[in-house]
Amino acid sequence: MDESRIETHIRPLLGARSIKGLTLWDIEGMQADIVAGRTAKPRNGRGGISTGGTGVASRAVGTLRSIMGHATRLGVIEKNPAAGVRLVASAPKTRRLSFAELRLFGQAMRAAEADAEHPVGLAAIRLALLTGFRRGEILGLQHSWVHGAEGYIAFPDTKTGPQMRAIGPKAAECIAAQPRRPGSPYVFPGDWSDGHFIGMVRVLERVCDKAGLDGVTPHVLRHTFASVAGNLNFSELTIKGLLGHAPRGVTQGYVHLDIALVVAADKVSTAISDMLDGRG
């Protein structure tokens, strides 16, 4: 990955300069150029789509800082000018993917799949976007809880107790497409244990690196689902019900699901699926 940053971002911007002549201003200028997308370009192979952004720029500065630190230890230069660089601010915690970013993210997911990225991780990420579920709810999901034809999942325990949570057909299709492992109750089983899959964050980081998207965490996927629901003009109460924040979706002691939530889950997950697949 460091080699990729060097060839894609550092060398095009600073490759003609002598290492002894580089200043803090040069490196901060490089960072600004990467943020602005000056080094953005398509590329073949596992690297996928290369763009700019604050995260890409910060990582490039970190790579250059390490290189120049090594040069300092070897006596090639007296001082590491990258050590004093002020990194650009990271994305706020309320980050969510815009419609354009969702399309770009979908492209990166397809590129990752073509590059033999972990299929369980990719499926877990897709389901998170299609449902707005928390990371723990996604990874701990068990087949016996899923009622795809009826449009809901019956969680025996969540942050607010047992819940029936609405899902759309696109989410149900994603779940149904997962191969069952004999003896495992999990929709997303672990690679080497009886537990569930745990590598979702690492897969997400690699997909985001391909897409050039910064500050994207599993919680951002949850925010994105809520944001799309808002753009489709669903009420705050309905969105809270979809996310499991409010008791609206559960009545009569965990045996009835509000039909309005099923309709909303269908529309939101279909819209997100279309954007991911390049149709929306």
Which residues are covered by each model-predicted region?
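Active-site/catalytic core of tyrosine-dependent DNA strand-transfer enzymes
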Residues: 1-5, 98-103, 150, 168-214
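Short, polar N-cap/turn motifs at the start of nucleic acid-interacting alpha helices
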Residues: 79, 144-152, 214-215, 234-253, ...
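Basic/aromatic-enriched alpha-helical hairpins
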Residues: 1-48, 67-69
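C-terminal flanking helix
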Residues: 65-68, 72, 258
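Short basic/aromatic active-site micro-motif
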Residues: 22, 118-122, 214-232
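Catalytic-site neighborhood detector that most strongly recognizes the C-terminal catalytic loop/helix
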Residues: 89, 96, 154-161, 236, ...
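Basic, Lys/Arg- and aromatic-enriched nucleic-acid-binding interface segment
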Residues: 36, 40-62, 73-135, 139-140, ...
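C-terminal secondary-structure termini that scaffold catalytic or DNA-interacting sites
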Residues: 36, 107, 111-114, 177-184, ...
